[in-house]
From Swiss-Prot:
This is Vesicle-associated membrane protein-associated protein B. The gene is VAPB. It is found in: Endoplasmic reticulum membrane. One of its GO terms (cellular component) is endoplasmic reticulum. It comes from Sus scrofa (Pig). GO terms for molecular function: beta-tubulin binding; enzyme binding; protein heterodimerization activity; protein homodimerization activity; protein-membrane adaptor activity. Residues 185-217 are annotated as: Disordered. There is a cross-link at K147 (Glycyl lysine isopeptide (Lys-Gly) (interchain with G-Cter in SUMO1)). Keywords: Acetylation, Coiled coil, Endoplasmic reticulum, Isopeptide bond, Membrane, Phosphoprotein, Transmembrane, Transmembrane helix, Ubl conjugation, Unfolded protein response.
Length: 243
């Protein structure tokens, strides 16, 4: 007896294509349409039930309606040299009057009432040009971030360590500048006093005015020289820190 032709329409009709990589679950959809004026029962079977999850794997499609079936391939180690021998079969029959117990209805169905369509599984790896660049982009960003972040952190740490020393040196410089300014004013005042003494009329009965105390002037000169040397040392320290 001739086999009854499948009344359901299948999209795709002959192949279920699964596109890798296969390190995660890969899902493809199978659309079942019922162009008839009667409700149709269906079930989806596979030769490798442990490798696939099918949702829904059975049901009833109303007249003129359609349903999408998700076929999920579980992760596995893909071998391009190994051809897939997995197959799916969509089996169908017109729904009986009583659909309360579909398991019994399938068991009681006559072979001539059953219709089926077979599809083979095809595994595909994405082409080089079609591969997503997210992984590469993330890798580049990560590498760039690592390269730029390390010097910044090191520089910040170095700056934090140097800031204390620089601050101390700057405070010392300010103190020395104030001291130099004070000495300059004191030296200027002494010179003015010395000039005033020189301009005063010399009285015959009065002893000649004594010039500015040499010891004091020598002390000022010595202190100025010491400050100059100290400034030089501070400059060298700042130069080393800056480097």
């Amino acid at each position: 007896m001739a086999k009854v032709e499948q009344v359901l329409s299948l999209e795709p009709q002959h192949e279920l294509k699964f596109r890798g990589p296969f390190t995660d679950v890969v899902t493809t959809n199978l659309k079942l349409g019922n162009p008839t004026d009667r409700n149709v029962c269906f079930k989806v079977k596979t030769t490798a039930p442990r490798r696939y999850c099918v949702r829904p794997n059975s049901g009833i499609i109303d007249a003129g309606a359609s349903i999408n079936v998700s076929v999920m391939l579980q992760p596995f180690d893909y071998d391009p040299n190994e051809k897939s021998k997995h197959k799916f079969m969509v089996q169908s029959m017109f729904a009986p009057a009583d659909t309360s117990d579909m398991e019994a209805a399938w068991k009681e169905a006559k072979p001539e009432d059953l219709m089926d369509s077979k599809l083979r599984c095809v595994f595909e790896l994405p082409a080089e040009n079609d591969k997503p660049h997210d992984v590469e982009i993330n890798k580049i960003i990560s590498t760039t971030a690592s390269k730029t972040e390390t010097p910044v952190v090191s520089k910040a740490l170095s700056s934090a360590l140097d800031d204390t020393e620089v601050k101390k040196v700057m405070e010392e410089c300010k103190r020395l500048q104030s001291e130099v300014q004070r000495l300059r004013e004191e030296n200027k005042q002494l010179k003015e006093e010395d000039g005033l003494r020189m301009r005063k009329p010399v009285l015959s009965n009065s002893p000649a005015p004594a010039p500015a105390t040499p010891g004091k002037e020598e002390g000022l000169s010595t202190r100025l020289l010491a400050l100059v040397v100290l400034f030089f040392i501070v400059g060298v320290i700042i130069g080393k820190i800056a480097l």
